[in-house]
Amino acid sequence: SAPKPFQVSRPQRRTMLSRHFSSIVENLVGSGDSYAELSVERIITAGGISRSTFYSYFDDKGDLLVAMAQDVIGDLVGVGHAWWDLSPDATKADLRRALRLPINTYRAHRTIFGAVVETAAYDARVREQQQSLIDQVVASLADHITAAQKAGTADSTIDPKRGAQWTVWMLEHGLYQLVSSADETEVEQLLDAVTDMIWRIFYAGYRPEVG
């Protein structure tokens, strides 16, 4: 029998639409409006999508934000592995290179991440998604700290879970408050500062600072 034509599933179609809307929303917010100020009508008009199509896949613009954020959150968690996967003899320069990746990813999608932070204050769906991101990163960092402590390459007096919680929330707020609006020169200085802090907290005296 003839093969069936390729069909896009509903979840796949939702993902495709959310990716389409991501660039639309980034342009609209880049023009000066906050995500909260954007109406569904304005979003779908700019995106060239009918109202019926929009509501076939999204409950409202909060649901759209959850879908748009899913991709960029996955990217952010993915590049975080550059830090978790550092070898036991990784130097401070290696740490700096690893920390650059989430900073670059955040800057590339700062509009969506910023909308997540702002919308999480009043939309439980977005808040749950933000917390899920935090929980994933905290768990990964805590595992990394635990493994490094066992290997003798991180301060063994630090509580891995709570140390990870403090560090991740600090980074989350720093990305939103400091990195999102910084120019290239300032980003480099912020990267230097956060590398110094994390190195001193976890690794100083336990692994070589230079190779």
Give residue ranges: language-model regions.
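Amphipathic alpha-helical linker/stalk segments
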Residues: 5-9, 21-23, 29, 68-95
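All-alpha amphipathic helical-bundle segments outside canonical DNA-binding/catalytic cores
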Residues: 93, 128-133, 150-166, 185-193
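Short secondary-structure transition hinges
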Residues: 108-139
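Hydrophobic alpha-helical connector segments
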Residues: 67, 81-108, 160, 164-167, ...
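C-terminal peripheral helix-coil segments that are non-catalytic and often amphipathic
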Residues: 1-4, 139, 143-150, 165, ...
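Secondary-structure edge/capping motif, primarily at the C-terminal ends of alpha-helices
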Residues: 80-87, 113-120, 148, 174-182
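Short, amphipathic alpha-helix enriched in basic
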Residues: 14-40
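Helix-turn-helix
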Residues: 31-63, 67
